[in-house]
A protein has these predicted regions:
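Alpha-helical transmembrane segments within multi-pass membrane transporters and channels
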Residues: 58-101, 108, 243-248, 279
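Transmembrane helix-bundle core of multi-pass membrane transporters
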Residues: 85-161, 188, 212, 254, ...
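Membrane-interfacial amphipathic/re-entrant helices at transmembrane-helix boundaries
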Residues: 1-21, 50, 61-62, 89-96, ...
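Membrane-embedded helix boundary and interhelical linker motif in transport proteins
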Residues: 10, 32-77, 81, 86, ...
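Short, non-helical or kinked segments that cap or interrupt transmembrane helices
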Residues: 17, 26-49, 88-93, 164-167, ...
């Protein structure tokens, strides 16, 4: 029985790490702006296409840092063009803008690619096979959770120990009062989007190493699952988002191991409904009171 489950368990831990890198972007933006960045999954997809086109002309080792830089620029541009002008607008307007950006990015990718799936390049070493007990998997399966944990530890350290991290925490606690304390709101928000986009780019490289085909809408499902992970863990809580992502990744793969592959996606969204019904703040989220 263990021999059968082990490959799915390893895959679940790996997928959970990939969801976690996306989920942190959702939860950081929500923590600062109280906004669900619906375009985040499309930025993740764009990172996949960046790699496809850049790796066609440059070595993969050069392409990866370029992909990260381009993805960060895209995330920064989205924030400046679509969200910054609406800083004082009603929250519904910002949410509609986020949905519009998502569809804009999807349609741009459809236009550029003609709607055709693109083959993701093979990345040396992490695409190699490795045997762990009775299971054979890719090196990326082992690298993903380790890299995810290291990146999250680095991020938490930045938030807790640095000046920009203190500013992020201040803005998250009280958006209106923070500017009166000399905090540059625009810089904090831009930094938040930059970090979220960077993590999405890393998650994209890890994700598409296993799922080698990139389409304009491929980021929708991992993006939604990462969002559910953020809600499950307590949106606004980075550790909560990471734990929620690993739980979802492991559970959906164990469901596949039991032979219920069709219901693996349904489990994630059933979990979302249960969380919203019984614990809307998630595992580690705090109840937020609106100021009148």
């Amino acid at each position: 029985m263990f021999d059968k489950i082990l490959p799915y368990l390893l895959s679940g831990i790996s997928v959970g790490g990939q969801y976690a890198l996306i989920a942190v972007g959702y939860t950081m933006v929500y923590g600062i702006l109280r906004l669900i960045n619906f375009a985040h999954g499309d930025i993740f997809t764009a990172a996949g296409f960046f790699m496809v086109y850049i790796a066609a002309t440059l070595p993969v080792q050069v392409a990866i840092p370029l992909v990260v830089v381009l993805t960060v620029i895209l995330g920064f541009t989205v924030e400046r063009a679509a969200y910054k002008p609406l800083r004082s607008a009603p929250r519904m307007s910002v949410m509609i803008s986020a949905i519009g950006v998502s569809y804009l990015l999807q349609n741009l990718m459809w236009y550029v690619t003609g709607g055709l799936a693109k083959q993701y390049p093979t990345i040396p070493w992490i695409s190699n096979s490795i045997t762990i007990g009775p299971a054979t998997t890719k090196v990326v399966t082992i690298v993903t959770p380790i890299l995810t944990i290291l990146l999250v530890i680095a991020l938490v350290t930045i938030i807790q120990k640095t000046k920009i991290g203190m500013a992020m925490r201040a803005v998250s606690k009280d958006f209106e009062t923070a500017p009166l304390m000399g905090i540059k709101i625009d810089s904090v928000i831009s930094t938040t989007f930059i970090i979220g986009s960077l993590l999405a780019a890393v998650g994209s490289v890890l994700y598409f190493t296993n799922y080698t085909s990139v389409t304009p809408t491929v980021g929708a499902m991992p993006g939604l699952k990462a969002f559910v992970a953020a809600v499950f863990g307590g949106i606004g809580s980075i550790p909560g988002a990471v734990i929620g992502a690993f739980i979802i990744g492991i559970c959906e793969n164990l469901i596949k191991a039991l032979g219920y592959t069709t219901f693996s996606d349904a489990f994630t969204f059933a979990l979302l409904i249960v969380i919203l019904l019984f614990k809307p703040t998630g595992l580690f989220g705090e109840k937020i009171s609106e100021k009148v």
